[in-house]
Amino acid sequence: MMEAAAKRVHIIQGEYKVVSDPDVVMTTILGSCVAACLRDPVAGLGGMNHFLLPGTGNVTGGDATRYGVHLMELLINGLLKQGARRDRLEAKVFGGAKTIASFSNVGEQNAIFAMQFLKDEGIPVISSSTGGDHGRKIEFWPVSGRARQHPLSGAETQKTVAMETRPVPAPKPVANDIEFF
C-alpha cells in the first residue's frame, strides 16, 4: 500500500516545509496551534506550516517563527519559489482547539487568523477542521492534497499542550560562524 511506503516529514511548531515528492506525507500534532496545508494542484507541490500564535507587528529573529503571519508568508513564498502560482493555491486548515479551559482561547484566535489571512490573500480554503477541546494528529499528502486527521485522547492532548507552552529554543549558531564587532 502506498501509505506504508510514504516518506514521513514531521512539522514541529515554528516550522514550514514545501515538497513536490508524491511519496511524502507531512505530519504534525496540534492542540491550540494551527497548521495551514497549501498546494498548487497543477504544479504538483504543496506544503505545511505549524504556528503557535496568530500575528504580531514587530517580532524578528527566532521568535518570529512562532507567529502565523510570518509562517504563512514563508509557506506561500516557498511554494511560489518552487513554481506554484498564487491563483492556483488552495488550502486546508487544522487545529485551534481550546485545550486549557482557564486560558484565553488562543486556539480560536489562531483559526480565525488563518482563515482571514487566506481570505485576504485570495486563497480558497477547501477544507478545515478547527476548534473543539481535543488535539489532532494531521497527515497531509502535499502533492495529491489528501489530508487525514486523528483526534487525540485527553491525555495526548495534555501532552501536546505541554509541548506548545514550552518555549521554542532559538537556533544554535553554526560552529563556523564569524562574529564581527
Curated annotation (Swiss-Prot):
Record EC number: 3.5.1.44
Gene Ontology molecular function, alphabetical: protein-glutamine glutaminase activity
Reactions catalysed according to its record: L-glutaminyl-[protein] + H2O = L-glutamyl-[protein] + NH4(+)
Keyword tags: Chemotaxis, Hydrolase
Chloroplast in keyword set: no
GO biological process: chemotaxis
Pfam families documented for this protein: CheD
Family: Belongs to the CheD family.
HAMAP family tied to this protein: CheD (MF_01440)
Role this protein plays: Probably deamidates glutamine residues to glutamate on methyl-accepting chemotaxis receptors (MCPs), playing an important role in chemotaxis.
Entry-linked PANTHER family: CHEMORECEPTOR GLUTAMINE DEAMIDASE CHED-RELATED
Protein's UniProt name: Probable chemoreceptor glutamine deamidase CheD
Organism phylogeny: Bacteria, Pseudomonadati, Pseudomonadota, Alphaproteobacteria, Hyphomicrobiales
